[in-house]
């Protein structure tokens, strides 16, 4: 798979729905292209979020990151990484770091004072990645959800 120097980071576009869906499955969130198209379309239209992809000439899209800016009452605005995945065959070669840099640049321009990410307690490799890239572990919490 590709080396870091050959990885290009760019804004995602609707035509990226298929590889984004495949990569989402590697993250544990399987989706068909038909399911991904409206999700990606909505994300691309949102002014307070950005989606970037990592691609190589030989392998196409090998990763993506989705980040959003959150205006908060209790603290200064911050960005949150909503999702980040690199193709299993391309991990630990720098693409994730480049995607994170693109998201951080976008967040700064959006007026965010910091960035946070939530990661499943079982994803030790991801935790190491975020620590390596300057994040600090600051909270353990329980997550709740409700269908609407």
Question: What spans do the regions from the language model cover?
Answer:
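Conserved G/P- and acidic residue-centered "switch" motifs that form tight phosphate/ATP-binding loops
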Residues: 94
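Conserved GNAT acetyl-CoA-binding A-motif
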Residues: 100, 107-119
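Active-site/acyl-donor-binding loops of N-acyltransferases
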Residues: 140-147
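Conserved active-site alpha-helix within GNAT-family acetyltransferase domains
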Residues: 97, 121-140
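Conserved N-terminal entry element of GNAT/NAT acetyltransferase domains
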Residues: 1-15
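A short, internal acetyl-CoA/4′-phosphopantetheine-binding micro-motif in the GNAT/acyltransferase core
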Residues: 84-91
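Acetyl-CoA-dependent GNAT
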Residues: 11-18, 22-77, 87, 100-101, ...
């Amino acid at each position: 798979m590709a080396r870091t120097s050959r990885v290009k980071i760019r804004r995602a576009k609707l035509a990226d729905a298929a590889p984004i869906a495949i990569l989402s499955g590697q993250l544990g969130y399987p989706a068909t292209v038909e399911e991904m198209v409206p999700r990606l379309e909505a994300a691309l239209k949102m002014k307070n979020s950005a989606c970037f992809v990592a691609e190589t000439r030989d392998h196409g899209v090998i990763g993506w990151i989705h980040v959003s800016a959150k205006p908060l009452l209790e603290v200064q605005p911050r960005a949150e990484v909503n999702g980040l995945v690199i193709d299993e065959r391309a991990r630990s070669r720098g693409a994730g770091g480049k995607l994170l840099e693109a998201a951080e640049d976008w967040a700064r321009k959006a007026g965010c004072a910091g960035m946070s990410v939530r990661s499943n307690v079982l994803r030790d490799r991801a935790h190491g990645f975020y620590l390596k890239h300057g994040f600090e572990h600051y909270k353990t919490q329980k997550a709740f959800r409700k269908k609407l």
